[in-house]
């Protein structure tokens, strides 16, 4: 019996953490949780600000439990002249934890573009300061997996300052 609950909890955890949901971009994760509560027989309510309320019932004094569904992420801070992007963190995201991570950029048109965060001068064999360079959001850039060599070409893909949310992908572990 205990392994049934554990397996269910692990399946739900995997499903939830794989839904892109940086702060301000949580509607899909909230819908998923709402549907799961409804499937269990509860009556979830999505608030006007996108929160989720679920009365679990019970007896005695009431108890309020709170949790958050959002994850860390970033947003486009600058479209650089070379077509790369400079990003700003959303939440407590730390630059030194993002280098070489795959990111998904969500355009307003619903298009998802992939890219990689890396040091601006990432050529270890020619950059003598590579290991000494502090990783900050001023020294990292996002290179899209698209052929762009200018700000105009990147903007033509639907990417611009402040409009595109970025989901920092976690490595897959099995």
Place the predicted regions along the sequence by residue.
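N-terminal hydrophobic/helix-forming segments and targeting peptides
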Residues: 1-169, 173
């Amino acid at each position: 019996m205990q392994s049934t609950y554990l397996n269910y909890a692990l399946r739900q955890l995997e499903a939830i953490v794989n839904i892109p949901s940086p702060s301000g971009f949580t509607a899909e994760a909230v819908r998923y949780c709402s549907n799961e509560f409804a499937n269990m027989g509860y009556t979830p309510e999505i608030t006007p600000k996108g929160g989720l309320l679920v009365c679990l019932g019970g007896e005695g004094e009431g108890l309020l439990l709170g949790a958050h569904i959002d994850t860390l992420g970033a947003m486009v801070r600058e479209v650089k002249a070379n077509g790369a992007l400079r990003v700003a963190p959303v939440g407590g995201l730390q630059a030194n934890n993002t280098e070489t991570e795959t990111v998904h950029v969500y355009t307003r048109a619903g298009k998802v573009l992939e890219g990689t965060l890396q040091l601006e001068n990432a050529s270890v064999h020619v950059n003598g300061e590579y290991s000494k360079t502090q990783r900050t959001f001023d020294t990292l850039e996002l290179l899209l997996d698209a052929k762009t060599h200018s700000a105009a070409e990147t903007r033509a893909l639907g990417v611009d300052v402040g409009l595109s949310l970025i989901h920092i992908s976690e490595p897959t572990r099995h």
